[in-house]
């Protein structure tokens, strides 16, 4: 199967705000019709940004559920040094993201992230540094670093069960 690597992923940037807003509603539609999702603590989210949402990363589908839970446009930070299968290549292209090389952090990643926070927007990050599937990895330090520099609170979030979210959805079972 064809994959897209660091050259493609490293060139991506977040899409315009209105586009991410539309995609948030697509996530709401998909999440509410194809999967059974329970959200707890949504009332604890800040009423307006900026803030950094830090979430575990057990599934390739986590960004969809992340968007579903927050229900506002999110600027994701995502690894550019990975391979993405053709089946999933549309997602980073359509949504866009702030690319980060997990082996060497570039100043442009920090600048883009701080720009998001200065505009009062939401920054989404998976501190694990990649999909870990069933174990929490030791978090990277970037979440706290960006929160401090951007003077934005960190909102913790957890997703579980996303890897099984689509089971039975084609049969009408949610």
Name each region found by the language model.
Residues 45-104, 112:
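Catalytic core of membrane glycerolipid acyltransferases/transacylases, capturing the structured
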Residues 66, 91, 115, 145-150:
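Hydrophobic/aromatic ligand-binding patch that stacks against planar heteroaromatic rings
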Residues 26-28, 94-100, 126-131:
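Short, basic, glycine/proline-bearing loop/turn elements
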Residues 102, 109-110, 114-136, 144:
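Internal catalytic-core helix/loop-beta-alpha segment
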Residues 50-52, 120-126, 155:
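Residue-level preference for the first positions of well-ordered beta-strands
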Residues 2-41, 65, 86-95:
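A transmembrane-helix-recognition feature enriched in membrane-embedded lipid enzymes
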Residues 5-6, 135-174:
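A cross-family acyltransferase "interaction/gating" segment
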């Amino acid at each position: 199967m064809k994959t897209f690597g660091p050259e493609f992923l490293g060139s991506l940037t977040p899409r315009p705000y209105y586009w991410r807003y539309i995609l948030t509603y697509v996530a709401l539609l998909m999440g509410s019709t194809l999967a059974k999702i329970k959200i707890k603590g949504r009332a604890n989210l800040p009423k307006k940004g900026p803030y950094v949402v830090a979430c575990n990363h057990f599934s390739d589908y986590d960004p969809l559920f992340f968007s579903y839970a927050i229900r506002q446009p999110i600027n994701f930070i995502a690894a550019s040094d990975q391979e993405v299968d053709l089946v999933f290549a549309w997602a980073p292209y359509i949504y866009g993201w702030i690319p980060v090389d997990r082996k060497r952090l570039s100043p442009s990643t920090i600048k883009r992230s701080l720009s998001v926070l200065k505009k009062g927007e939401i920054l989404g990050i998976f501190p694990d540094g990649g999909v870990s599937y069933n174990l929490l990895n030791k978090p990277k330090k970037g979440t706290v670093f960006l929160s401090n520099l951007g003077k934005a609170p960190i909102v913790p979030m957890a997703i579980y069960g996303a890897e099984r979210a689509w089971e039975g959805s084609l049969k009408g079972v949610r």
